[in-house]
Amino acid sequence: MELETTKYFILAFTHKSMSLEMREKLAINSPAILKEFLQTIKNYCPNIKECMVLSTCNRFEIYASLKHNTHADEQKNALLKILAQNKKMSVSDLEKCVLMSTDESAVHHVFSVCSSLDSLVVGETQITGQMKNAYKFAFEEKFCSKDLTRLLHFAFKCAAKVRNLTGISKQGVSISSVAVKEALSIFEKEKIEDKKALVIGLGEMSQLVIKHLLNKQFEVLVLGRNAAKFEDFLKELEEPKKVSFQNIENLNAYINAYELLFCATSSPNFIVQNCMVKETIFRRFWFDLAVPRNIEKPIFNNIFLYSVDDLEPMVRENVENRQESRMKAYEIVGLATMEFYQWIQSLEVEPLIKDLRELARISAQKELQKAVKKRYVPKEYESNIEKILHNAFNAFLHHPTIALKKNAQKEESDVLVGTIKNLFNLDKSSTNHAQNLNLYKCEYYEE
């Protein structure tokens, strides 16, 4: 009897392989569109058991588990066709930029991404939260179950270990902090004394920008749609008096009044359009941190626009400064990948061990009941004898249990498990799926 091991599969498009223009086309910022896309995969790729999508400003990735004996290349071709049709792109263009990973390399990739080793800004912690949200959505919409839950559960543990055992996140660097650092450098070079900034949007990226600006003693005007959300956000700030709010409908009134602007919304269209921009005597510095981009390319020469990809050179110094921590982090990820597969293999024997113990308990209980019924054993001794039998079978199964767990990490474990199931007639035994899933349910709500 051959045990089916989970086949993990990933398609990845990242800032390393794909331009910002193409990543914009792939980006999914709407829950409704994401659900529709995942449903399309489910409908047209029957050999994909579970799937989820991670869509950020720097990457678009599909994580999946495949049915037994499924060819990864076939699933890759099917998914590229779905993407091409869904995003109105050519398969050949996507083929040039895609990275496919399976099995151990796929697991290693997920752990590296979650630990922020594959990020534009190495060590930034925002990606872990984004992965938790992506998993949460797919899990609650029933597109992923046991396989991806186990994978993501372990990935978050790996990311926490990387943060705790290396100094890779101590500087708190992120896209938002790099952007604010560059803005501060510009202000110093330009000798601009009036430290004011306009921030469009109130999502996670914008909130990080605001916090970094406040740390650098800027006054901030936020343009958004949700005043209640802004009031809740103020409670997180040490200096809330330096931040004010206006509805984004008033954008025209403020767009030409600030030298510094940051924009990061989930809108698929341009928020800042050239038709609303007027010429000014002062130079302006705009940071578009959204994907798809929120700011139309300016027509005036004294407006300097920075996109996410434009920040990459500013990030290189950060990467170089973290090489030692990065090497240690990769060691942790490599070890975690190995431990993950050992854990997965051990899970195959856990139900068997449970079934063996249950079989022993039931057999002992039956014989004890017979003995009591035939008065071989006084009724008042029944409880004590039951405890003795329980301890005896635990002692009897102790060594086999250890041996099973040890051999679960070996390639021949499927033969051993199959043989034991046949010997004890346990082939038809099954553990409740929902209970099994809860054991490995990922705490996506944790920090």
From Swiss-Prot:
Site, as annotated: Important for activity: H109
PROSITE patterns, per the entry: GLUTR
Keywords associated with the record: NADP, Oxidoreductase, Porphyrin biosynthesis
Pathway annotation from the record: Porphyrin-containing compound metabolism; protoporphyrin-IX biosynthesis; 5-aminolevulinate from L-glutamyl-tRNA(Glu): step 1/2
EC number of this enzyme: 1.2.1.70
Known catalytic reactions: (S)-4-amino-5-oxopentanoate + tRNA(Glu) + NADP(+) = L-glutamyl-tRNA(Glu) + NADPH + H(+)
Binding site for substrate: T56, C57, N58, R59, S119, E124, T125, Q126, Q130
Residues the entry annotates as binding NADP(+): G201, L202, G203, E204, M205, S206
Family: Belongs to the glutamyl-tRNA reductase family.
Domain notes: Possesses an unusual extended V-shaped dimeric structure with each monomer consisting of three distinct domains arranged along a curved 'spinal' alpha-helix. The N-terminal catalytic domain specifically recognizes the glutamate moiety of the substrate. The second domain is the NADPH-binding domain, and the third C-terminal domain is responsible for dimerization.
Identification of the protein by name: Glutamyl-tRNA reductase
